[in-house]
Amino acid sequence: MKNNTVDFVSFSYYMSVAESTDPNPERGEGNIMGGVVNPELEVSEWGWAIDPEGLRYALNSMWDRWHKPLFIVENGLGAVDKLVDDASAPYGKTVHDRYRIDYMNDHLVQVEEAIKDEIPVMGYTSWGCIDLISASTAEIRKRYGFIYVDLNSDGSGSLQRYRKDSFDWYKNVIATNGESLKR
């Protein structure tokens, strides 16, 4: 690192990981990074711990270690989204993904708290803006985007795109520079 320093540190954050001294701890299927189930945290339907405060902790920890500006390049919630009819939505359909809005709101509030801790956060990008096929599972059942793509894992579907409720929510967060976040 001495000869090839970096200008900033970028990282992805989806969940925290807990450890235990118990020789036979409960391990959840969502703990892809190892670790054990944290009974204090909610988990997504994929078993990933939902830990917004863990993001603030990670930001503080990385700053303390490297003293480089930080860039969150991936953060989001994968879920099985249900497309529903909604006459008020463009194209007459949407996904009411309050769970994604809550996840992102709570994580962005913690980014704001880290900034108040004087952590230099360069930026934040969500994962992802549009539903896509998973590189690890080659399926689209688990969706992250603000835009729903009518595509199934077997390849069927019209490929029509629909804005989810989170699309307009995130658009408003950007337009208000975070003032619309619920604290």
Model-predicted segments: where are they?
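Non-catalytic scaffold segments within catalytic domains of secreted glycoside hydrolases
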Residues: 1-183
